[in-house]
Amino acid sequence: MRHTLLAALLLASAPAFSATTLTFQHGVAGYLSSQDTMIRSNETGSGEDSRGNNYGTLDYISVDGDDGSPGAKPNQGLIRFDNLFGNAAGQIKAGDTIVSATLSIYVDNPGSGFTMYDMLTDWSQNTITWNSIGNGIQANGIEAGTAPLFSIGANDGAENIGTGWLTIDLTSSLQAAQAGSVPGYGWAMVPFSAGSNGIDFHTSEYADANFRPLLSVEVMPVPEPGTWAMLAAGLALIGGIARRRT
């Protein structure tokens, strides 16, 4: 009887293997490592040439298939979260299993839509321009990945995406970054070629931190060696008791 109680206590005292959700939002809980901006190709509006301008200080991003009529002057968006992986509290550990990862952005102007790709070229929100990356971001396997991660809306001028929170599934991208298959430089948001109704959303510079881009990552931690040892001891003890009884 005493052995049975001991085994039960060993198993009961072992921590449950449950998933944990980590959140990363600029300016919240000490996290200050997100970057986001847009790059613009318009050089027709009022004689202004936007291609060499940097927009990293703005509190919004516009993803638009034609932001400067007449004709195909797109804006592209970029967003990244650095310092996601490591051994510090709140980071994704090397041995953790990433169960899911979602990016939530707050849309304050409805628009056509966009497609999202892994960024393969390093960039900074304080320096990148349409010209500096070479005529905008190309999904060519060099600047950005060739396979879309996410796509929403339609290739037209309608308001296909409404206002409010938009959630984007980036599980496969975060898993690839953890494995080292992609460099973890964030993501490019590329508008549809005829998506002339720009979608605008708040950036990490937005005054109210609660409406800034939010990355949520659900992870399953790897049990500590001591936990495995405790479970093994409990199971072995139960097995021994069962054998003696038979």
What are these regions (language model features)?
Residues 202-221:
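A recurrent domain-boundary module in secreted/ectodomain proteins
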Residues 223-243:
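A short, hydrophobic C-terminal helix/tail in secreted or cell-surface proteins
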Residues 2-8, 227-230:
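Sec-dependent signal peptide recognition
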Residues 19-89, 193-195, 206-212:
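Flexible, small-residue-rich N-terminal segments that precede or flank a structured functional core
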Residues 189-203:
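Short beta-strand-plus-loop segments that form exposed binding edges in beta-rich domains
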Residues 13-15:
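N-terminal signal peptide c-region/cleavage motif recognized by signal peptidases
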Residues 23-28, 107-183:
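Beta-strand-rich interaction/scaffold domains
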